[in-house]
Amino acid sequence: MNELKNDRYLRALLRQPVDVTPVWMMRQAGRYLPEYKATRAIAGDFMSLCKNAELACEVTMQPLRRYPLDAAILFSDILTIPDAMGLGLYFETGEGPRFQSPITCRADVEKLPIPDPEQELGYVMNAVRTIRRELAGAVPLIGFSGSPWTLATYMVEGGSSKAFTKLKKMMYAEPQTLHLLLDKLADSVILYLNAQIKAGAQSVMVFDTWGGVLTGRDYAEFSLNYMHKIVDGLIRENDGRRVPVTLFTKGGGQWLEAMAATGCDALGLDWTTDIADARRRVGDKVALQGNMDPSILYAPAARIEEEVSTILAGFGQGEGHVFNLGHGIHQDVPPEHAGAFVKAVHALSKPYHQK
């Protein structure tokens, strides 16, 4: 594989020295970019875009052509695993993802297969290989998966949810059924992420989008427990380099100590957690990624720069910070505002890395 020309992102995740704070954006390949919309129109629909390695590579590369980002992230979806398990993923206009065959009982869980990542999910691995070739060592490629708990929310609810009543009913009335489902999902995620690493992903991230809807005790038992299992099962060195793993629980700022104790390399922060406080609590164990409110990208460039400056000052001097948004970029953000954000991170972070 090509030698990395810019390894700032990987170095920051391992709390090694960098010249400026690295930056990328969750959902950086997405609907805020007109070129993404054009490519998606060619593909026909979202899953066709994910399943076409050349087009998935094209949309992964689009933000890198516009902005000096320090990492690329695989263009895919967190629901590829449940789809490969046979639940029949489809997208309702204006409704988001849905499943034709949601999980309703223990028998449904027992018959779920664990997908072979090079077979049922081979299209994802083809995309990883294609993107790595196209990147030619410019920046590292991030692979990712949803967390078992977050995947389970969609699989049991049948799609997106606000209250998660079906899943919470299972959690409290049939906890063993839910544990069986989460265990199968953790095994599937380990295989899936390890296959991405073998195909060329240089760092991986686990997105626990819905962990924040749980009580502390339930989070430990039904979400973090399974992310810990994943961290333990991942390939941590490939191609002569450490493969850093980042855990991100949206709404999980109160559990950072427990998350850091999993042995992961970095934690993602949403914008509701103060980054200075987070660094005081866990900065000696893990790197931190985040954590600007994505809605600030609606503001003028001067306001974006002010927020970047505040977050950089909050983290302070030294290593172990990857700048990002606290969640995905919104689809109606002007692309030039994203550009102002990336430029501000690099320009304003230099003084924090001078010896």
Swiss-Prot record:
One Gene Ontology cellular component annotation held by this UniProt entry: cytosol
Binding site for substrate: 27-31, 77, 154, 209, 327
Record-annotated membrane-spanning stretches: none
Pathway field: Porphyrin-containing compound metabolism; protoporphyrin-IX biosynthesis; coproporphyrinogen-III from 5-aminolevulinate: step 4/4
InterPro entries: UROD/MetE-like_sf, Uroporphyrinogen_deCO2ase_HemE, Uroporphyrinogen_deCOase
Localization (cell): Cytoplasm
Pfam families the UniProt entry points to: URO-D
One GO BP: protoporphyrinogen IX biosynthetic process from glutamate
Record keywords: Cytoplasm, Decarboxylase, Lyase, Porphyrin biosynthesis
General function of this protein: Catalyzes the decarboxylation of four acetate groups of uroporphyrinogen-III to yield coproporphyrinogen-III.
HAMAP family assigned to the protein according to its UniProt record, in alphabetical order: URO_D
Subunit structure: Homodimer.
Protein name (Swiss-Prot/TrEMBL): Uroporphyrinogen decarboxylase
Annotated source species: Yersinia enterocolitica serotype O:8 / biotype 1B (strain NCTC 13174 / 8081)
